[in-house]
Amino acid sequence: MSEHRQALGRYGEELAVKHIRQAGLTVLECNYRCPLGEMDIIAREGETIIFIEVRTRSTGSRGWGEESITAKKRERLYRIATHYLKYRNYKEWPSLRFDLIAIRCQDQEGKQPDIIWIRGI
């Protein structure tokens, strides 16, 4: 992955964290890694644990972030969430939700990125 894409991804994740904190969620972890992959953000809203995938794009030439979650990716996110709950010693299975935050950073001077939060993907 190019340095530009990595920097864009980090920027998007930072924006997403600010956005979900402003919405009143508690961020539990960022960039949770396990043998099955990585979860961008894990947060809590009340009693619900939310696993959040962040997709940041600067152009729609390959599709926007909200168009990029496949069934295979969704399944991998579920497996990572199961790993997280098991290895964080949750005694009971909490209420879960999987969200997507898509960030569009179009190159228009002075324009704030568009943040699209899709709950329950």
Curated annotation (Swiss-Prot):
Domain of life: Bacteria
Annotated disulfide bonds: none
Lineage of producing organism: Bacteria, Bacillati, Bacillota, Clostridia, Eubacteriales
Protein family membership: Belongs to the UPF0102 family.
Database matches in NCBIfam families: PRK12497.1-3, PRK12497.3-3, YraN family protein
Pfam families the UniProt entry points to: UPF0102 (PF02021)
Gene Ontology MF, one: nucleic acid binding
Coiled coil: none
Protein name from the UniProt record: UPF0102 protein DSY2577
PANTHER family: UPF0102 PROTEIN YRAN
